[in-house]
Amino acid sequence: MNQTWRTHLQSKLQQLHEREQYRNLHVTEQAEETWLIRDEKRMLNLASNNYLGLAGDERLKEAAIACTRKYGTGATASRLVVGNYSLYEEVERSICDWKGTEKALVVNSGYTANIGVISSLVSRHDIVFSDKLNHASIVDGIILSGAEHKRYGHNDLDHLEKLLKTASPEKRKLIVTDTVFSMDGDTAYLRELVELKEKYGAILIVDEAHASGIYGIGGAGLSHIEDLAQKIDIHMGTFSKALGCYGAYLTGDAIYIEYLHNMMRSFIFTTALPPGTLGAVQKAIEIVQEDHKRRENLIANGEYFRSKLRDAGFNIGNSSTHIVPIVVGSNENALRFSKRLQEAGIAAIAIRPPTVPINSSRIRFAVTSQHTIADLKWAIDRIIHIAKEEELFV
């Protein structure tokens, strides 16, 4: 290996160790279950995105197997070549019916959706206004686009309006936000964002990754709770979280989607999703609309878990969903807390910069519809006990 490169990479890795930001891969089995196996130890799973417990659902498995047997294991090409199976059009029609939109585009992941949609729609001549706590894929899409990037304080609508008011009237404007923020568990003020985008002639993109399948009518997303869906220009959502599958979608007015499938590089220059994945996705979309009980259980479990941790004195920020952080400050605190929790049989992972701002390292808990109150109480008792021993109330 080239010695200059070796020295450079070793130096960068050493810096990560010194900042306690080095990350390891841990062998995990049965992550689709309420109890998983991590490093050969059985733990209560409070770390996954399998919010409705569908990743292990037999109906999804059977749908995936049936489509794999019929169409094979791979798409064989990009969608614009010969990879556009009829399954794609079926899934996209289902998304439009579910979301009440004109047209949809299925893509390979939430990350490729966000970097693709933003970098396709705007360029160095435009401005993007982005919440400070938006997902990294949104930030990367803005960087890739070359557009002017204006970050407003988290959920700070006054700051956003000030930025919109002072922006050049010559430039096209795009506002983008998560609906449920993945590391904080709070939600965007969608009604006010719609008002601002209309007032200042912007378009609005929302990332429903952690809301799709859970909130709104039939689990269509947070934007459907307040009947705002038709006023939002483009919705992005994933199949990899509440729907228990893989992939993502973009949906909105037909002209947006037509433009994206012609211009979005992360869609054009990649092989399509496997047919088995699409079969599972189609079944998952059907299930989440019909199975109200799973969604109700998830929301109730989130309320229970949040209230108990808040009452115990933990800093859980403004979480109002199934994602519940305990903010502990330093990287060292988060790593120590995570280690003790895993030793006690709780799969809970330390989240550190650059994923979250400096000095806001945390344990990110994610409850699911499949957890019982007994599971959560068992975990809460251990969380409180360990935090007291380690003096980790912040």
UniProtKB/Swiss-Prot annotation:
<feature type="binding site">
    <location>
        <position position="182"/>
    </location>
    <ligand>
        <name>pyridoxal 5'-phosphate</name>
    </ligand>
</feature>
<protein>
    <recommendedName>
        <fullName>Putative 8-amino-7-oxononanoate synthase</fullName>
        <ecNumber>2.3.1.47</ecNumber>
    </recommendedName>
</protein>
<dbReference type="GO" id="GO:0008710">
    <property type="term" value="F:8-amino-7-oxononanoate synthase activity"/>
</dbReference>
<dbReference type="InterPro" id="IPR015424">
    <property type="entry name" value="PyrdxlP-dep_Trfase"/>
</dbReference>
<dbReference type="InterPro" id="IPR001917">
    <property type="entry name" value="Aminotrans_II_pyridoxalP_BS"/>
</dbReference>
<dbReference type="GO" id="GO:0030170">
    <property type="term" value="F:pyridoxal phosphate binding"/>
</dbReference>
<dbReference type="InterPro" id="IPR050087">
    <property type="entry name" value="AON_synthase_class-II"/>
</dbReference>
<comment type="pathway">
    <text>Cofactor biosynthesis; biotin biosynthesis.</text>
</comment>
<feature type="binding site">
    <location>
        <position position="23"/>
    </location>
    <ligand>
        <name>substrate</name>
    </ligand>
</feature>
<comment type="similarity">
    <text>Belongs to the class-II pyridoxal-phosphate-dependent aminotransferase family. BioF subfamily.</text>
</comment>
<feature type="binding site">
    <location>
        <begin position="207"/>
        <end position="210"/>
    </location>
    <ligand>
        <name>pyridoxal 5'-phosphate</name>
    </ligand>
</feature>
<keyword id="KW-0663">Pyridoxal phosphate</keyword>
<feature type="binding site">
    <location>
        <begin position="110"/>
        <end position="111"/>
    </location>
    <ligand>
        <name>pyridoxal 5'-phosphate</name>
    </ligand>
</feature>
<feature type="binding site">
    <location>
        <position position="135"/>
    </location>
    <ligand>
        <name>substrate</name>
    </ligand>
</feature>
<dbReference type="InterPro" id="IPR004723">
    <property type="entry name" value="AONS_Archaea/Proteobacteria"/>
</dbReference>
<keyword id="KW-0093">Biotin biosynthesis</keyword>
<dbReference type="InterPro" id="IPR015421">
    <property type="entry name" value="PyrdxlP-dep_Trfase_major"/>
</dbReference>
<comment type="subunit">
    <text>Homodimer.</text>
</comment>
<dbReference type="GO" id="GO:0009102">
    <property type="term" value="P:biotin biosynthetic process"/>
</dbReference>
<feature type="modified residue" description="N6-(pyridoxal phosphate)lysine">
    <location>
        <position position="241"/>
    </location>
</feature>
<keyword id="KW-0808">Transferase</keyword>
<feature type="binding site">
    <location>
        <position position="355"/>
    </location>
    <ligand>
        <name>substrate</name>
    </ligand>
</feature>
<feature type="binding site">
    <location>
        <begin position="238"/>
        <end position="241"/>
    </location>
    <ligand>
        <name>pyridoxal 5'-phosphate</name>
    </ligand>
</feature>
<dbReference type="InterPro" id="IPR004839">
    <property type="entry name" value="Aminotransferase_I/II_large"/>
</dbReference>
<dbReference type="Pfam" id="PF00155">
    <property type="entry name" value="Aminotran_1_2"/>
</dbReference>
<dbReference type="InterPro" id="IPR015422">
    <property type="entry name" value="PyrdxlP-dep_Trfase_small"/>
</dbReference>
<comment type="function">
    <text>Catalyzes the decarboxylative condensation of pimeloyl-[acyl-carrier protein] and L-alanine to produce 8-amino-7-oxononanoate (AON), [acyl-carrier protein], and carbon dioxide.</text>
</comment>
